[in-house]
Amino acid sequence: QVTLNLSRAVDDSIQEAVLKVTLTLEDKDVYYYTRIEQNFNRSARECLNFAKSIHEKTFDKQYAEELEAYLEPNEESDNTTLQTVNIHSNISHLQWGDLNPQVSTDVDWSIKECNTVYTSLLARYQVTCTGDSGEVETYNVKEFFRVRCNAGQMYLLDYSRTMNQIFNGNK
């Protein structure tokens, strides 16, 4: 593991730059390119805390009214399946319908983009729940949030969640 201290790598007058990392393996060089930006007092922590709060409240029906305020339900969403849920879904689907899943792993949070307008975050985790046949089933879940913080007010700009069942060959 290598840690790069980039605090002084980019002049304050430069807002965005390309970082090139070269890894030399025997006789070959491997290149990795990424974008780095200056962080001028952005609200990534507030956006992450907001997304975590929404994530947790989807598992508790008592927060239905609060969560409903962030949804934009319309015909763009397929409210017949819990496999894909988005900001256009109804509150029942956002809150897992009658599935009653239990988070069975740590939730892995990552910031995908952070700029002056919004922050995009991704949560990855697994849930277990009882399936139609009465057996415990496990699902991989990805939850995407696009959040804006403006003058202390939080806005959910986009949301999507997908879940895919993990195949169990023993059943």
Stretches found by the model and what they are:
Residues 47, 51, 66-69, 124-140, ...:
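N-terminal secretory signal sequences
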Residues 1, 16-98, 171:
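Core segments of small alpha/beta cavity-forming domains
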Residues 3, 22-24, 34, 58, ...:
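Residue-identity detector for threonine
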Residues 8-44, 135-171:
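Short beta-strand edge/turn micro-motifs at domain boundaries
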Residues 1-19, 89-135:
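Surface-exposed, charged secondary-structure patches
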Residues 66-73, 118-129, 157-164:
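Generic hydrophobic segment detector
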Residues 75-76, 85-88, 116-123, 136-141, ...:
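A broad "ordered helical/assembly scaffold" signature
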